[in-house]
């Protein structure tokens, strides 16, 4: 676009400023998602994006907020471009704000390539089925809710639960075993407090994990509009590293609830008709557009795996945010307040947790041939032990049979030995499966009906087996 075009698309016709939005009248040729440059009456430069166009009226969201803007002397220039981010492998080890500007004191990135942050949809016929195991070092995920390369597996948490610690541990420990390809982590934080931001930064820097991590950080006191851009910046960076540089990328996004609250705030400012619990009706489409940027493409070496984290309001798994997320993603890892109260970390409740693509990433040649059977048997035994624990609270332990007492003991040991691990404990998949077998040895061998007999003979610690 030449200078004349730029000049003719500069307007001082702002008619309204409301919340994060401003309305510009008399606009020619404005387009949805177009980037605008804003000059405040004090001469400060800001950036915005067109949200809506109707005839000659454009509604613009301002990334840095609308404070100090007025309807008399605010200048708005329409650039004819969509939001883009300059990308380079030098972004690994760097920290950016929610709109991609460095905030770690380092130099600006010299980009190898610029990409639209809205991404381009993957052709469904070009998608490759997610496969290959990603080891997180956490037994409840690796052993029973396996994360597979190219999958989207959210973590459902509650206020006050240690999801931040779990996210940092996964970012630090995650790896693709038996692969020579490079592995990277993109960490996108939305609406987090300064205390949480300091925790993540200290965690990444002190453990040396930052060198393979790119961080996009939007704080709670940053504009809500920036919160909408943060996951787009993170996912565009992931697409560049995965599909242009052939890396395996794990994207951790926290907190999706804050992202959806920002959607609701902007929707309210636009006077849109609200949907369930005040959230916009297009929230499902918006979340799907974000989650579906995970995956693998035929002929491409790299992959994008997503682990979004969301805090369920009032621990309500039927709330629209976890509800819609569950429709789109391929399972969920659920954190339990009850386990957290007993001091167990990570407090993963395996019974409502699920990885729908687990079968594609486990077994001989990927993890171990007994993995599926061990997982099924652990689920069955723990579920029965939990039921017996509830029964014991009613009838007392004296009413239980010897068999029942063994399942009850198994449930206690499972929580204390398998679920519980320290925040810096990185268990291999072999250690996780061996631990599972050790716990199953508490039960009579005749109860191990979900594992093939040959694996029982091969892996069950014989000295501890009770017939």
Swiss-Prot record:
Highest taxon, organism lineage: Archaea
Keyword Cell membrane in record: yes
Keywords for the protein's UniProt record, in alphabetical order: ATP synthesis, Cell membrane, Hydrogen ion transport, Ion transport, Membrane, Transport
Cellular component GO terms, alphabetical: plasma membrane; proton-transporting two-sector ATPase complex, catalytic domain
CDD domains, A to Z: ATP-synt_V_A-type_beta_C, ATP-synt_V_A-type_beta_N, V_A-ATPase_B
Subcellular location: Cell membrane
Topological type in the membrane: Peripheral membrane protein
GO annotation terms (biological process): proton motive force-driven plasma membrane ATP synthesis
Pfam family, one: ATP-synt_ab
Function: Component of the A-type ATP synthase that produces ATP from ADP in the presence of a proton gradient across the membrane. The B chain is a regulatory subunit.
Protein family membership: Belongs to the ATPase alpha/beta chains family.
UniProt-recorded name of the protein: A-type ATP synthase subunit B
Organism: Methanosphaera stadtmanae (strain ATCC 43021 / DSM 3091 / JCM 11832 / MCB-3)
């Amino acid at each position: 676009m030449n200078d004349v075009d730029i000049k003719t698309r500069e307007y001082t016709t702002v008619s309204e400023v409301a919340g994060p939005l401003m309305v510009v009248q008399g606009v020619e040729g404005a387009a949805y998602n177009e980037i605008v440059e804003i000059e405040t009456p004090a001469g400060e430069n800001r950036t915005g994006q067109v949200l809506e166009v109707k005839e000659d009226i454009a509604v613009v969201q301002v990334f840095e907020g609308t404070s100090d803007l007025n309807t008399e002397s605010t200048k708005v220039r329409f650039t004819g471009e969509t939001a883009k981010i300059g990308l380079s492998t030098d972004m690994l080890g760097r920290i950016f704000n929610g709109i991609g500007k460095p905030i770690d004191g380092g130099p600006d990135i010299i980009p190898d390539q610029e990409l639209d942050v809205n991404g381009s949809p993957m052709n469904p016929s070009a998608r490759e089925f997610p496969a290959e195991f990603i080891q997180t070092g956490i037994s409840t995920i690796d052993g029973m809710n396996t994360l597979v390369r190219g999958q989207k597996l959210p973590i459902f948490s509650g206020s006050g639960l240690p999801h931040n610690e779990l996210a940092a541990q996964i970012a630090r420990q995650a790896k693709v075993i038996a692969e020579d390809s490079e592995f990277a982590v993109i960490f996108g934080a939305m609406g987090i407090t300064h205390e949480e931001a300091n925790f993540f930064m200290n965690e990444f820097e002190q453990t040396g994990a930052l060198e393979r991590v790119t961080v996009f950080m939007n704080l709670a006191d940053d504009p809500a509009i920036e919160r909408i851009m943060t996951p787009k910046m993170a996912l565009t960076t992931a697409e560049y590293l995965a599909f242009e540089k052939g890396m395996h990328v794990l994207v951790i996004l926290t907190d999706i609830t804050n992202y959806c609250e920002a959607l609701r705030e902007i929707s309210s400012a636009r006077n849109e008709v609200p949907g369930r619990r005040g959230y916009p009706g297009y929230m499902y489409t918006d979340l799907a557009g974000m989650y579906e940027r995970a995956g693998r493409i035929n002929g491409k070496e790299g992959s994008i795996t997503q682990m979004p984290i969301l805090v369920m309001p009032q621990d309500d798994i039927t709330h629209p945010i976890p509800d819609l997320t569950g429709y789109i993603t391929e399972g969920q890892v659920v954190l339990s307040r009850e386990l957290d109260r007993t001091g167990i970390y990570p407090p993963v409740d395996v019974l409502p947790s699920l990885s729908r693509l687990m079968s594609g990433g486990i077994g001989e040649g990927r993890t171990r041939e007994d993995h599926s059977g061990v997982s099924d048997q652990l689920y069955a035994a723990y579920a029965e032990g939990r039921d017996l624990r509830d029964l014991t609270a009613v009838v007392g332990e004296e009413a239980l049979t010897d068999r029942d007492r063994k399942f009850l003991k198994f449930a206690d040991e499972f929580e204390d030995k398998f679920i519980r691990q320290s925040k810096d404990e990185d268990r291999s998949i072999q250690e996780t499966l061996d631990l599972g077998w050790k716990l199953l040895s508490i039960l009579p061998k005749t109860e191990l009906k979900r594992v093939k007999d040959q694996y029982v003979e091969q892996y069950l610690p014989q000295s501890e087996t009770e017939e």
